[in-house]
Amino acid sequence: MPAPNVAAPFVIAEIGCNHGGDLDLAKRMILSAARFCEVDAVKFQKRDPATLLTPEQYNAPHPEPRHAFGASYGEHREFLEFDIDQHGELARYAAECGVVYSTSVWDMPSAKAVVGLAPPFVKIPSATNQHTELLELLCAEFGGIIHLSLGMTTRAEEERIVALFRDRGRLSDLVLYACTSGYPVPFEDICLMEVRRLREAYGEDVHAVGFSGHHLGIAADVAALALGAQYVERHFTLDRTSKGTDHAASLEPDGMRKLARDLRNVAKALTYKPVEVLPIEQAQRDKLKWRA
């Protein structure tokens, strides 16, 4: 049986909002992810809180006050936002560090702004993967690869997404992510076999299948690779005890570095023997093998 061609996975450190609205901290995180962790890409998030939130949601208190960066939830979200010029600065800094910049886009104003930056890829989060106008905009105006998470998404919704991309001639530019939307996700809810299901259902048509994890540790990510994930995304922080709701389900630099290392090593190991007795085995065979 021929050896499968298992490419090294593309590893994404999701900085998201773990920078706490601090541009200098965001740059330190990029540097750590690129030089120490040796990931392939760093990813942020771009939102327009006034567009995403109703007045009631905007003016409500943060549901977890100890993690709030503002008097209301809307002010909290505004505090964590970088404007598009700052995103451009982060993209340039990432390039200097030798790592790809990307961001999730949550709404129309954010998507229109990020399209102008022309990153290699953008991400549609699970929360907005049914925002048809947003998907249409990216299909029409964004020339790069479009990543999309399928957390909290029904099969019917998933099929509508795939049909839209197929109808717009962009299915080959789509990366579908198996994902469970929870922070953190217990192991029994990770549902890794979704990676295999997506590969079997769409693997011949989409650009790739990925895995976006919000669990603890790195074992599940390596298993996702073995099941066919070509992109692996994990939240990244410099300190899991920092203020903010995403830090607890994030990897610190040591963990992200080990994840990138283990994924690349396991990718090398995912093969059949190309010959019945490997060269590395021959000396031991000559010395130890029982001869009938």
Question: Where do the PLM segments sit?
Answer:
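Catalytic cores and adjacent flexible loops of soluble metabolic enzymes
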Residues: 1-292
